[in-house]
Regions:
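Cationic, amphipathic, low-complexity alpha-helical segments enriched
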Residues: 1, 5-18
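Aromatic/hydrophobic pocket-lining residues that form π-stacking "cages" and hydrophobic walls in ligand
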Residues: 1-5, 28, 59, 92
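Short beta-strands and strand-loop turn motifs
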Residues: 16, 40-43, 71-76
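Short loop or secondary-structure boundary microenvironments that flank
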Residues: 17-18, 45, 135, 160
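Rossmann-fold NAD(P)-binding glycine/threonine-rich loop
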Residues: 17-41, 47-61
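C-terminal substrate-binding/catalytic lobe of Rossmann-fold NAD(P)-dependent oxidoreductases
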Residues: 65-195
Length: 195
């Protein structure tokens, strides 16, 4: 198994794959920690997404006081991206669920395929957070979170213009990893993510 190979190797690891760690994360982290290995994991290495994630959590804390606002999410990526919703969208959703008492799980909303066909629905229970996904063109990644009430809407968006932000974050993470041990993530690199 991949995780046993990881545990016996004598190198540092980056795993920018959310699905793999959702399935094997606890075991991989345990094997790395027990074996004196270093693992740095993130669903997204972008510096901008890290900042956006902190803003997202803070906004969810504020919105917890205002039940008239419902929250939804959308993510847009290039046509080659197969998973939906994206790992970044799931991570952002988890940040909302941690801070907004009226939501306790995320669900897949609509999915717009590269050919324009739409499946799924944005309809969900009051305790669910809908994440809609769009696949079009060569979009590096757009994530939007919208709080909507009868009076107004509040929307925050991160729009990657290219892959430079991902590369910068990966370099910063690699530099950090070279000086630290254990199971690490973006909240270790950027402590503001822990708030």
């Amino acid at each position: 198994m991949r995780q046993r190979v990881i545990a016996t190797a004598k190198i540092l690891f980056f795993i920018p794959n959310l699905r793999f760690l959702f399935e094997h994360g606890d075991e991989v982290k345990r094997l790395c920690t027990e074996g004196g290995k270093t693992l740095f994991w993130s669903s997204n290495f972008s510096l901008g997404v890290s900042i956006f994630s902190a803003v997202n959590k803070y906004l969810a804390k504020i919105m917890n006081q205002f039940p008239a606002y419902d929250v939804t999410m959308s993510e847009t990526h290039h046509i080659h991206k197969m998973d939906a919703p994206s790992g970044t969208a799931i991570t952002l959703a988890e940040g909302i669920l941690e801070n907004l008492d009226r939501k306790d799980k995320w669900v897949e909303g609509t999915f717009q395929a590269p050919d324009g066909t739409v499946s799924g629905s944005t309809e969900c229970a009051a305790n669910e957070l809908s994440i809609s996904s769009i696949r079009e063109g060569e979009v590096p990644g757009i994530h939007s979170i919208r709080y909507d009430s009868e009076a107004d809407s509040i929307t925050i968006t991160h729009d990657a213009k290219n892959r430079r932000g991902f590369a910068l974050g990966a370099v910063l993470a690699a530099e950090y990893t070279a000086k630290h041990e254990g199971a690490l993530g973006m909240s270790d690199l950027f402590p503001f993510l822990k708030d």
